[in-house]
Structures are given as structure tokens and as C-alpha cells.
Regions:
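Core alpha/beta structural scaffold of self-assembling particle/tube/pore-forming proteins
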Residues: 2-35, 48, 71-329
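N-terminal assembly/attachment segments of tailed bacteriophage virion structural proteins
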Residues: 40-43, 100
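N-terminal low-complexity, intrinsically disordered segments
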Residues: 45-76
């Protein structure tokens, strides 16, 4: 069975002092999801095929001298694909050589590219849909977008109908629940390859010597058990008021409690809430509300983190404030 580790854990196993660890550190700085999301190697060169249990076998109370009818569970196979996220960084050789440590300079110059890839990955994690963009992977929203679907019981309708709607997600990361994947035979995380000195061309066609670096990140998402993901959809940001119990306001703490109660067993993985900046800012300001008993600040891995019922609340700017209303289809 493959192991599910965060990218930081994978980097440490490869080499505690490797450049990969530095890249992962840069990734984590601008993408809080990577502090929680675990990855495992897929069983396909292009993704991962998993067997999902769709029904449990029946058990029977037996009387003496009476037999028991055989029963079996029902399963379905699901194939999740990975996407290939790539970019190139090009830097003037003269500039890179000035500080005497070319490798460190190239990595520092590449931070903008790494952050761009981070944002693209986070956006795809929440909104990727291979029926629209085949080159990406299928994210969370495409899996939880129908109130009448079987997994619609894990979509909580916050009641919003306007144009400034958002979602709050509760994801329980784990090998048997939901986790990231990378292709069979490849490496976890973002790969950096220095292509060395090349001749570059400026906007006017002029030639100059420079260094080219290739970045590649192959990743995807697989969901073993949809019961361990909850979407609080149709959250109208205009109704997030100072007093969540005021008339016309969204009682977000109550919705968060409902989400927690939908998870069958929180110990099956690492539960984390994800929301955008506006929602987490509201939650942080609620800490000093005299009525608040659920929201607090906790220290997780040396960082101060907003928590709800001791579950971390991560800020993810990839979550939109202009989502379409989630309805029954």
C-alpha cells in the first residue's frame, strides 16, 4: 500500500538538505493547502485507479439450526487523472553570476514562477473539471455540485442566491479518504531542472546568454470516500455580520458544526476547513465575540492558526467570491 505524506515529508525523505526541500518550503509559503494535503503515488502512469465501496454487505442474526445467506459488498472502480503543470524561467547569465552563487539566485528568481504554479494548482484543486479543461484534473467543486446527487447529503445549502456566493470546505485528508496523487514512477512535488546556459532572445529579436530552468509539477486528486468531504455552499458574503445570530445573518458557526457532524469519523484522517480571506477574517474577528465558544487561535506546527472546534481553518484565495449557486439538477 502506498504511503500518504505531505510534500514536506516527501522532500525530507529524498534528502534532508536537497534543493527539493527548499522548493517545497517556497510552495508551502504561498499555499496553505500543502501543509495538510497528503500525496501518494498513483498506480497508473497518468493517474490512479481506485476501488470505491458503494455498499456494505448484510449481516444476519442466526438462530440455532438455521443458516445464514451469503452476502457481499458492492464496489465501483474510479480512475482519476493527473495534470502536467509546467513553466520555464529565463534569467540573464550576467545578472545571475553577479552575486557569486548562481544556483541560489536562480531559485530566488524562480519564486514568482513557483507562486504562479501554486495558484494554478490551488484553483484546479477546487474548480478543476476535466470535462471542460481536459488537461487539468478533477477538483472538489466538480464532484460536489448537485444537491440531488448521492453525495448531495454532504453539501450544506447556506441559502444564498446572489452574485457574491462562496463555499467553505471541510476535507479530511487521508489515504483511505481523499488525497493527492502523482503518476506512477514519478516524483512527488514540483521538479526543478536547470537546463544550463542557452541563447535567449529579447522582445526586439536581440540575442544574449542566459540560464533556463524548467519547472514541472504532475499532480491530481483521488477521493476514496466522499463522506469525508463536506461543502458548505451558497454562502452569501453580504450576510456575514458581526452577530451571526442577528436577523437575516448567516449563522456560520452552526453550519460548520453541521459539517463536522457529517464526517463519519474525524480520526480517519486530518480534518481541515478551507475558506477565502473574507470568511477567515470574519472568523478571526469572532474570537473576541462574547457569544463565541467554538473559534480560537491555536498553534499548529509552530504557526498560529485559526481553529474551529480544534480543526484548523486555512485561508485559500483560490476559493471564489463569485461562485454559481449550487442547486439540485
Amino acid at each position: 500500500m502506498p504511503q500518504a505524506l505531505t510534500l514536506a515529508d516527501w522532500a525530507k525523505r529524498q534528502d534532508p538538505n536537497s534543493k527539493q526541500a527548499k522548493i517545497v518550503e517556497l510552495l508551502n509559503q504561498s499555499n496553505e493547502i500543502l501543509d495538510d494535503m497528503v500525496f501518494a503515488e498513483g498506480n497508473l502512469p497518468t493517474g490512479h485507479r481506485t476501488t470505491v465501496r458503494t455498499g456494505l454487505p448484510e449481516a444476519t442474526w442466526r438462530m440455532l439450526n438455521y443458516g445464514v445467506q451469503p452476502s457481499k459488498s458492492t464496489t465501483a472502480q474510479v480512475t482519476d487523472s493527473t495534470g502536467m503543470l509546467e513553466t520555464y524561467s529565463e534569467v540573464d547569465k550576467k545578472l545571475a553570476d553577479l552575486n557569486g552563487n548562481t544556483s541560489e539566485f536562480l531559485l530566488s528568481e524562480a519564486q514568482a514562477f513557483i507562486e504562479s504554479m501554486n495558484q494554478e494548482m490551488a484553483e484546479t484543486l477546487f474548480y478543476g473539471d476535466t470535462t471542460v479543461d481536459a488537461e487539468r484534473f478533477t477538483g472538489l467543486s466538480a464532484r460536489f455540485n448537485d444537491l440531488s446527487a448521492k453525495n448531495g447529503v454532504n453539501i450544506i445549502d447556506a441559502g444564498g442566491t446572489g452574485s457574491n456566493l462562496t463555499s467553505v470546505w471541510l476535507v479530511t485528508w487521508g489515504l483511505n479518504t481523499i488525497h493527492g496523487i502523482y503518476p506512477k514512477g514519478s516524483k512527488a512535488g514540483l521538479e526543478q531542472q536547470h537546463l544550463g546556459e542557452v541563447t535567449l532572445t529579447d522582445d526586439k529579436g536581440g540575442k544574449y546568454q542566459g540560464y533556463r530552468t524548467h519547472f514541472k509539477w504532475e499532480n491530481g486528486l483521488t477521493m476514496r470516500d466522499w463522506r469525508y468531504v463536506v461543502r458548505i455552499a451558497n454562502v452569501d458574503l453580504s450576510k456575514l455580520t458581526k452577530d451571526p445570530e442577528a436577523t437575516g445573518a448567516i449563522d456560520l458557526p452552526d453550519l460548520l458544526i453541521q459539517a463536522i457532524e457529517k464526517i463519519p469519523n474525524l480520526s480517519m484522517g486530518k480534518p481541515v476547513f478551507y475558506c477565502n480571506q473574507q470568511v477567515r477574517s470574519w472568523m478571526r474577528r469572532q474570537i473576541k465575540n462574547s457569544k463565541n465558544v467554538n473559534i480560537s487561535m491555536q498553534e499548529v506546527a509552530g504557526k498560529k492558526v485559526v481553529s474551529f472546534d480544534e480543526i484548523p481553518v486555512r485561508r485559500t484565495d483560490a476559493i471564489l467570491t463569485t461562485e454559481d449557486q449550487v442547486v439540485a439538477k
